[in-house]
């Protein structure tokens, strides 16, 4: 079985909430964060995230938890656009405490967790 990093050039980790979604675009080769964005959790925001992803060439995957909850609308939008979405388990509490809690950090963590699979 191939690891995600062998299949795509970037992973977009998304931290989903009821009003906003925060994303981090991570380069699979270098591990560097190429871009970050926070958008509204609505169709306009989803389109902004796809536009952000399209600024980075190559194959991509999206990683998020809550695809059936706060991330459901974004997940549907991405599925309609034929984007690859990886659903993550909620991080264990100690992992969440290992550093400051912030949406940008959680978005980056989502991308890195997907790459570790």
Map each language-model feature to its residues.
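Phosphate- and other anionic-substrate recognition elements at nucleic-acid/protein interfaces
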Residues: 1-117
């Amino acid at each position: 079985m191939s690891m995600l990093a062998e299949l795509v050039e970037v992973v977009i980790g998304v931290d989903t909430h009821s009003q906003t979604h925060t994303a981090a675009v991570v380069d699979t080769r270098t591990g560097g964060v190429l871009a970050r964005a926070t958008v509204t959790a609505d169709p306009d925001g989803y389109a902004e995230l796809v536009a952000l992803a399209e600024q980075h060439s190559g194959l991509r995957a999206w990683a998020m938890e809550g695809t059936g909850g706060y991330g459901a609308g974004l997940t549907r939008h991405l599925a309609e656009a034929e984007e690859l979405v990886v659903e993550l388990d909620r991080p264990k509490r100690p992992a969440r405490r290992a550093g400051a809690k912030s949406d940008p950090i959680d978005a980056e963590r989502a991308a890195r967790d997907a790459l570790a699979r």
